[in-house]
Amino acid sequence: VERSVESVFAEYQKELLEEYDIFGLDGSYETGSYTEDRVLDRMTVFGAIAGENQIEAIRFLSDNEGQEFADQVCRYLENLYGIDMIQDLIGREDEAKEQEEKAIDFQKREEENEKKMDEVLASGGSLEESGEGSEGEIENPLGVLQKLKHRVLAEIVLPRDRVISQKSVEGMAGVSGRTRQEGKGNLPSVEANASEKLYLIAYIPDHFKSYTKAEDDRPLEYEQEYLIGGKQNDMENLQIVLNKIRRFRMAPNFLYLQTDETKKAEAKVLAGIVSALLGNPGLTEVVAQGVLMAWAYGESIMDLRVLTAGGKVPSVKTKETWKLSLSGLLKLGTTQDSGSSSAGESGLSYEDYLKMLSLLETKETLRMRMLDLLEWNLKMRLNCPFFQADACITRMRIQSICQLRRGITYQFSTYYAYQ
């Protein structure tokens, strides 16, 4: 029996191992439908006696919200690289949470400012709001901000000649979104790994692609964005990620502007002109803050252009690293906008922000979304249309009952797990 069980597990799904470094036995035997009989029948091919064995306990790759999958990921990376693999991620989760809290707090401030600016704009409808006024007209930065916020962010950020993936897996329920086949019986518990999420994050770059490293043969090209967005099409996931990064960039950009007296003075001059044209010079200070908010928003778009082009953006700006002029803000998103930004060489990259955003997801969410991607890729890219993560066996215990002479029976168990 032991030899037959080992032989069965030796027939692991090779595409799963080659592509994702994960061991698993296809319990459906290329039918797409798991039954215990398929496994037991296969054991008889390797010498087990029919009718003497039954599956006492079993685990599938997706069991316990993907815990079986995560356990293999952790052991694979620990054995291959040791703790060095996650050394640079230690402490990054707390940093990511702190950044998120700042972004949430600043978003409230942004919303309050937006309400004030709506009131200002409503009080002076004659002022040109398009940001593309004709010669001699004063362009309204508040109107520019309104226009930008109503545009699809990806269309403003990404180069005009870059084709954005429109791929979708709608109608193909991933393992995270369907009723799953669950394992049964008692097996040794998977030992908790305090660094599991860090190992999952470290596993991502070598196994899943992103916007900056997309491959067009994949069901979803922006896989890392899917881990964060969870939508079944590339465009939505990319939009979610760009918006999250923009929120992270807004606060430090706005705070820098508050320290730059030259830029504050520029904003105040423009605010004074806008307020005068609105017929209410007393609004200058309020409008100036609105101009600075719009400027920070515009700079955040410039940051996204750098990041998506493969460059880096410093966490905190200086006079030297600030990119967008006030006149450039008024052209942003218009036909006069070049749509590009000079590359940055220091700071955080797009991939760094993806890691930060992934750290904000729960480990359960990451596990199951990884399994979604893994399953879609095996089905659609690696010619395994039958593959189901919840039919992929990782561990099993077989109970055997042998008939001896004189009516004596002998009962024993055989356990096997991919290690």
Regions inferred by a protein language model and the residue ranges of each:
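Long, compositionally biased low-complexity segments
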Residues: 22-419
